[in-house]
């Protein structure tokens, strides 16, 4: 069974983990109401997508993320 020959130093651990950081989420401005939303997603505030109303305004949107 394979076993490490030496203890991994903290600096080497950090170098290995340097690529594990999460990236920034992209945000776009809704063309209808100006609220921030995810690109290519229905606006969670007004229910518009691509200039059209897809979900009735005021209706609770299940599974939406408000940014």
From Swiss-Prot:
Gene from which the chain derives: rpmF
This chain's protein is named Large ribosomal subunit protein bL32
Positions of the region Disordered?
Answer: 1-23
Q: Which PANTHER family match?
A: 50S RIBOSOMAL PROTEIN L32, LARGE RIBOSOMAL SUBUNIT PROTEIN BL32
What is the annotated signal peptide range for this record?
none
Record's superkingdom? Answer: Bacteria
UniProt GO MF annotations = structural constituent of ribosome
Q: Source species, please?
A: Acidiphilium cryptum (strain JF-5)
Might you name a Gene Ontology BP term for this protein? translation
Annotated family: Belongs to the bacterial ribosomal protein bL32 family.
Q: Which UniProt keywords apply?
A: Ribonucleoprotein, Ribosomal protein
Q: Where is the composition biased (Basic residues)?
A: 1-20
Among SUPFAM superfamilies, the record links this protein to: Zn-binding ribosomal proteins
GO CC annotation terms, alphabetical: large ribosomal subunit
- Give all cystine bridges in this chain: none
């Amino acid at each position: 069974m394979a076993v490490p020959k030496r203890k991994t130093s903290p600096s080497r651990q950090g170098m290995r983990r340097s690529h594990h950081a999460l990236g920034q989420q992209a945000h776009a401005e809704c063309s209808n109401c100006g609220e921030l939303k995810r690109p290519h997603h229905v606006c969670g505030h007004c229910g518009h997508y691509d200039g059209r109303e897809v979900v009735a305004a005021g209706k609770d949107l299940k599974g939406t993320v408000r940014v």
